[in-house]
From Swiss-Prot:
Protein name in the entry: Sentrin-specific protease 1
Record GO terms (molecular function): deSUMOylase activity; endopeptidase activity; SUMO-specific endopeptidase activity
One Pfam family this sequence matches: Peptidase_C48
Subunit structure: Interacts with RBM33; promoting ALKBH5 desumoylation and subsequent activation.
InterPro entries (UniProt xref): Papain-like_cys_pep_sf (IPR038765), Peptidase_C48_C (IPR003653)
Residues spanned by motif Nuclear export signal: 635-644
Impact noted for substituting residue 534 to A: Abolishes SUMO2 processing and SUMO2 deconjugating activities
Known outcome of mutating residue 533 to A: Abolishes SUMO2 processing and SUMO2 deconjugating activities
Alphabetical list of PANTHER family matching this protein: SENTRIN-SPECIFIC PROTEASE 1, SENTRIN/SUMO-SPECIFIC PROTEASE
Active site annotation, chain numbering: 533, 550, 603
Length: 644
């Protein structure tokens, strides 16, 4: 033992540690013991160097790694350094020998905590140095003489689990897991997304800064697994470190109390992690820190403590604002934040919808006002046009168009009696006799190689539609009348001519004019059947125009073009020369220019009477009210094969 003591004897101000080929020297303080001011200074240096990065620290009382190579591999019991005041530290005597010093419980506790923190700091910053203190090297394992003299003795810990304490305090078995930047980024993104979700639902601002990763992950698992033991040590042991934190124990070293508060707060966070509804987080600028109230051995504390004691300026750590007792009822208003948010959104939507409806009503009112103004302005100008379209009453209607044409020599305008000759009683009896029931196939008139039966005559009775036989017979009578002196020569095509020309082309109808020269007459009459409607097209070689007449006001320029093309082909086929279309015009009479039918059955009568007036070079001066008269008159004319 004397040899061992001689080898371990050192100089007064120096300790030499041998590790492999390297020699590390630590210069000790010249005076004996550890003064509190120097310990506080070292603690302040440690705190200032690590405060910006260390988010969660932990509380543990151990010897300084720089002065005590013989550390505990397992956790010492809480009675050894928490409950009792028999905490021992190594000092240096005047002759260089190590000795124990037993200060007061408060200072000893702070020193032991600072020594433990110093040990952890030394481990984190100087891996090679801590390996030397632990008897390890980077390549080989050497056991120093001091370790042989003072072997490490494990101390059982009743408060903490052995596996967790060994993983925390044993540098030989603990391998710090490095957290990659990708993991930090993912965690930060998840926290930011959750913060935005909370802010959207509750309508409050949540400032949750980026957590630091300097705190080991295995420490959080160990602390969370032993939360029940920590709760007992925090709230039941009056002589423990928890009483110093919650009771805001004042000591001569302010930095030591700050570090202790941070350690205990981190313990409180992990031990109360299951009480998430009772923990309220806020921004670090709130300036207050709330502690729970317990009635075991902790005196009543105020709700607000200065945040400057726990967080340095510019720290990005999460700040625990208030920890509420689980027995305290939580205000129910926070659970209805989503409902209030929905109501607010609904109210905003309702206000927008009401504003939109108001604008729509204003636009409708403005449109109605403008429409009324336009109607009032056009009331006088369109009065005559509206009356013409409606034709009410028909008795007061006058001829729409009065065509002033140069009459040929020997022809004069006749009186109204000549235009509309009166039907005598004898003529009336004959017409009624035709309409009586009889043999429908009885031939009543025959001429122009056409035969008119009683069935055909019945189409002129009342509002029946005219058939092809009646129209073709009447057109032939117009051609026969045109042979009279002073009237324009007329040729009328069959009612099937235009339909055949349109569907089959010129080759299908070129033989229809084998015995007729269409270019030698003045007027060509072309009845046009549109399925259920009769119209008339007139080719006037004198005026060089093709005009379309429709009693319903229809426009059909296509029919006019088809007839003009027919004239070109007919001229080439019959006369062997081109038809000169220079000066020819195509017209479709508008509804304001010719009389319009006021029912759905007189279209055939209107087409025939258009042709009658045109072939006499007379104005079209009849109206809808004349249609019953024209029907009776046409019956008599067909029966006698002569126009009145």
């Amino acid at each position: 033992m004397d040899d061992i003591a001689d080898r371990m004897r050192m100089d007064a101000g120096e300790v030499t540690l041998v590790n492999h080929n390297s020699v590390f020297k630590t210069h000790l303080l010249p005076q004996t013991g550890f003064p509190e001011d120097q310990l506080s200074l070292s603690d302040q240096q440690i705190l200032s160097s690590r405060q910006g990065h260390l988010d969660r620290s932990f509380t543990c009382s151990t010897r300084s790694a720089a002065y005590n190579p013989s550390y505990y591999s397992d956790n010492p019991s809480s009675d050894s350094f928490l409950g009792s005041g028999d905490l021992r530290t190594f000092g240096q005597s005047a002759n260089g020998q190590w000795r124990n010093s037993t200060p007061s419980s408060s200072s000893s506790l702070q020193k032991s905590r600072n020594s433990r923190s110093l040990y952890l700091e030394t481990r984190k910053t100087s891996s090679g140095l801590s390996n030397s203190f632990a008897g390890k090297s980077n390549h080989h394992c050497h056991v120093s003489a001091y370790e042989k003299s003072f072997p490490i003795k494990p101390v059982p810990s009743p408060s903490w689990s052995g596996s967790c304490r060994r993983s925390l305090l044993s540098p030989k078995k603990t391998q710090r897991r490095h957290v990659s930047t990708a993991e930090e980024t993912v965690q930060e993104e998840e926290r930011e997304i959750y913060r935005q979700l909370l802010q959207m639902v509750t309508g409050k601002q949540f400032t949750i800064a980026k957590p630091t990763t300097h705190f080991p992950l295995h420490l959080s698992r160990c602390l969370s697994s032993s939360k029940n033991t920590l709760k007992d040590s925090l709230f039941k042991n009056g002589n423990s470190c928890a009483s110093q934190i919650i009771g805001s124990d004042t000591s001569s070293s302010g930095s030591a109390s700050i570090l202790t508060n941070q350690e205990q707060l981190s313990h409180s966070v992990y031990s109360l992690s299951s009480y998430t509804p009772d923990v309220a987080f806020g921004s670090k600028d709130s300036g207050t820190l709330h502690h729970p109230h317990h009635h075991h051995s902790v005196p009543h504390q105020p709700d607000n403590l200065a945040a400057s004691n726990t967080q340095s300026e510019g720290s990005d750590s999460v700040i625990l604002l208030k920890v509420k007792d689980s027995q305290t009822p939580t205000p129910s208003s926070t659970f209805f934040q989503a409902e209030l948010w929905i109501k607010e959104l609904t109210s905003v939507y309702d206000s927008r919808a009401r504003e939109r409806l108001r604008q729509i009503e204003e636009q409708k009112a403005l449109a109605l006002q403008l429409q009324n103004q336009r109607l009032q302005e056009r009331e006088h100008s369109v009065h005559d046009s509206v009356e013409l379209h409606l034709r009410v009453p028909l008795e007061k209607e006058i001829p729409v168009t009065v065509v002033q044409e140069t009459q040929k020599k020997g022809h004069k305008l006749t009186d109204s009696e000549d235009e509309f000759p009166e039907i005598t009683e004898e003529m009336e009896k004959e017409i009624k006799n035709v309409f009586r029931n009889g043999n429908q196939d009885e031939v009543l008139s025959e001429a122009f190689r056409l035969t008119i039966t009683r069935k055909d005559i019945q189409t002129l009775n009342h509002l029946n539609w005219l058939n092809d036989e009646i129209i073709n017979f009447y057109m032939n009578m117009l051609m026969e009348r045109s042979k009279e002196k002073g009237l324009p020569s007329v040729h009328a095509f069959n009612t099937f001519f235009f339909t055949k020309l349109k569907t089959a082309g010129y080759q299908a109808v070129k033989r229809w004019t084998k015995k007729v020269d269409v270019f030698s007459v003045d007027i060509l009459l072309v009845p046009i059947h549109l399925g259920v409607h009769w119209c008339l097209a007139v080719v006037d070689f004198r005026k060089k125009n093709i005009t379309y007449y429709d009693s319903m006001g229809g426009i059909n320029n296509e029919a006019c073009r088809i007839l003009l093309q027919y004239l070109k082909q007919e001229s080439i086929d019959k006369k062997r020369k081109e038809f000169d279309t220079n000066g020819w015009q195509l017209f479709s009479k508008k509804s304001q220019e010719i009389p319009q039918q006021m029912n759905g059955s007189d279209c055939g009568m209107f087409a025939c009477k258009y042709a009658d007036c045109i072939t006499k070079d007379r104005p079209i001066n009849f109206t809808q009210q004349h249609m019953p008269y024209f029907r009776k008159r046409m019956v008599w004319e067909i029966l006698h094969r002569k126009l009145l």
